[in-house]
Amino acid sequence: MIFSIQQLSDESKLSYALRFEVLEQLCPPELVSELLSRCHAWGERERGLNQLLVVYYVIALSLFRRLNLAAVLRHLVSGLRWLWSNPCLRLPTAAALVYRRRQLGTPVLRHLFQRVCRPMATEQSKGAFRFGLRLMAIDGTLDEVADTPANALYFGRMSSGKHQSPLPQVRCVYLAEVGSHAIVDAVFAPCRVAEQRLAPLLLSRAVQPGMLVLMDRGIVSAAELSTLVHQQQAHALARLKAGQYTHAEQVLSDGSYLVTLHPAGLPAVQVRVIEYRIEPHTAERLAEFPSSQTSNHPDPRQLHRLVTTLLDPQQAPAQELIFCYHERWEIEACIDEQKTHLRLSGQPLRSKEPALVRQELYGLLLAHYIVRWWMHQSACEANLDPDRLSFTHAVEVLDTACYEFALVARQELPRVKQRLLADLREPATLLPPRRLRFYPRVVKRAYSPFHRKRPGQQGFTLKKQSFKDILLI
């Protein structure tokens, strides 16, 4: 397959010749320019890179996490360099890029995330709807940030007994679409702010009519259930603690029962409670798994309890709701995609200032959404479940596509896009259908003969002396 190469004039400026089709499909330059104008973030001088390209650069920081700050920009222009008339293409230094990021600020990336990241699944998307409702899930995580005084002061460190987390951490709570793994809203806070405080903010502003939100037991409350039903015309399915909502008012045909809740200052809401156990042999094997350090040891006889605002057992049978709640683990996989495969687990966020940390987080979410959007388009084209496409393979394909899009002429872009969509679902890379699997919540820890690093244990530099000057014989 032969493609035409784009032609550049000798007067072309880098800012206008660069093209990011992989990103621009969802973040078109017109939209980014509009947000830059609204946030007064264009800057007085254009310099080597205008702020439009700085926005794309911030998103690319998460797509190419293995590269340092300056190398990310070099990677973005690697295709264009072969067409550039001047062989000595000078690019901004890492310090200059950080300066431009400070000028850009956080609002532009936040508004771009809010405008772009919406639920993407259609009625034809496999696994995206149940009971006529769009499946959503909410969950939180802690992300490590660069160990600087500013980050430590703003975000803080988690502690357990005598031990403190080695790096400052930021609390992130996400609302994601289950079928596509698209994160559609997020809130960030210092690490000591609990998920229970952040989740209501996320639910009140992001949940839309026709959604079924899957929640863990730490988030669900009578107030949230009332708000979802009466104010947002949405529904919830959540796990319950052992002593919650145990006074049955009416037992239904499938064994579930109804309870009326009266949250303070809000309308009463009727909910349905479902109880079930795991088959004894499997439950005993699961009980042998080590539990996390923050949870109780599992009991093989444990009674599992769910609560939902779907009251009709004919419309939503209890067994189907139990199967549906199992889909909440998709948001765990979604968080793993961005922490492990995009951000490369074990490495903190790059930014050394709180404002730039928030900017980087929005860039990370946009990068994850863009990867997932391309995967969803490819899966729908072939009538596949998006779960069958490999996320790591998709990141590699889009990495290569950034180079190819920069080389080809504009009239060739539709053909390159079709090849990209086909590459994403290459048969050899497709994942098998999901299987029922259980794994203990354990991690491998690297052994080290060295002492744990404490706060304040820093090295020092002798700027005016060499090793020869301090040597005594």
Where are these regions (language model features)?
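Single, function-defining residue in the core of a domain
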Residues: 1-75, 102-104, 111-115, 131-134, ...
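Extended, structured, electrostatic nucleic-acid-contact surfaces
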Residues: 77-87
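Major-groove recognition helix of helix-turn-helix-like DNA-binding domains
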Residues: 85-106
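A short, well-structured juxtamembrane/interface segment
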Residues: 118-125
